[in-house]
């Protein structure tokens, strides 16, 4: 691996300007935890009860004195906005009282790790009604149980997260809270949208930096290193998911994360990487050549096909649309394009779609929700009719069992953020397996194998559903703008 020293990195005028912007625009208002708590109560459909949520505790690796990297539990964060370990939150629905519990002061820990959050600091920082130390938690919950629990349930996410109380007849409800919170989390408020937008802005800068410097790189690891460096230097220390930097045939591996192979002799790189900002994810994929233009007709044709799939699906996003219908559209466009290239043949577009042959090349869902998780949660709706199920089964694969592509998913709503990430891949394993399946008659395997060296192409943006249509939150360059950045990087 070449040393990516300071002198090797190109800093564009856009990045230089951004440094000033980042320093002056990151003072955000409080996370709207109280608003979220009230929304959850509405979804629960009750006027009494106590919501109890535990944050992520400090945990060491097995057989080690070293702590695991901290990652806050997202349901807890949604009702608190607190990204600190060993905290708890309760919401008394009857009294509209949101209470945060922070760790008791520990002198030994403070000396070694720095002081923990005080109740005074927490009151100033977070949108809660009161803050107390952990020592008060058990007694506070016990008093609520003694006063209200005969008529009101104590809501928990899972049976394993029960608080310690002395009564054996506590009315725990571990079935209602999760779906209520999923329903509220599926639609983002303005604060959440700002966080996702900022995560996308930083991810866009990192993708741009990779494009500017790709001609200097000799290994996938250098791509990963520069992307992470750019995000961290913009104060986005955490990635929303493990970075994927697959070159050549590795681009056909959907979740390739080794990122350690040489780039020499390969055509394309599929870079699927997104920063996290204040616990909110971005999810961005770009596929680009290891040169100033597409290295082969095959690479250009597949990129243009995936580009068409994405553009046609994005422009149809609006509230009321069922995402599964966009999934079908993406497959239809893919089939038409692969038929033009001679890869699919021997039937009509509808016959090939119904056979499932297109899933050999497009094996995943068109997208998913984005929020506190990169594959975020959402409400569920009644399942489609059997007739609908028969129609859609040909484009539903195991990877589409969750998210907006499922038959059970509701129509898109204003405030949802979803990815649109079509892809076309040429996997040796998938093609070998397809030879044994009934739809093999629709595939020209000799023609398909000519495309194996390109690996695959995926393009992914994060799309906000608005009152009038959609807004693309992703700023990473793609298409001709992407190629121009690569060319300018070489010129510099």
Swiss-Prot record:
Residues reported to bind Mn(2+) 1: 283, 421, 460
Highest rank taxon of the organism: Eukaryota
Cofactors, names only: Mn(2+)
Protein name: Probable Xaa-Pro aminopeptidase ACLA_020440
Main EC class the enzyme belongs to: hydrolase
GO biological process: proteolysis
Catalytic activity: Release of any N-terminal amino acid, including proline, that is linked to proline, even from a dipeptide or tripeptide
The record's free-text note on cofactor binding: Binds 2 manganese ions per subunit.
MF (Gene Ontology): manganese ion binding; metalloaminopeptidase activity
Residue numbers binding Mn(2+) 2: 272, 283, 460
Biological role stated in the UniProt entry: Catalyzes the removal of a penultimate prolyl residue from the N-termini of peptides.
Keyword terms: Aminopeptidase, Hydrolase, Manganese, Metal-binding, Metalloprotease, Protease
Pfam family, one: Peptidase_M24
Entry annotated with the keyword Hydrolase: yes
Similarity comment: family membership: Belongs to the peptidase M24B family.
The EC number(s) this enzyme carries: 3.4.11.9
InterPro entries given in the database record: Aminopep_P_N, Creatin/AminoP/Spt16_N, Creatinase/aminopeptidase-like, Pept_M24, Peptidase_M24B_aminopep-P_CS, X-Pro_dipept-like
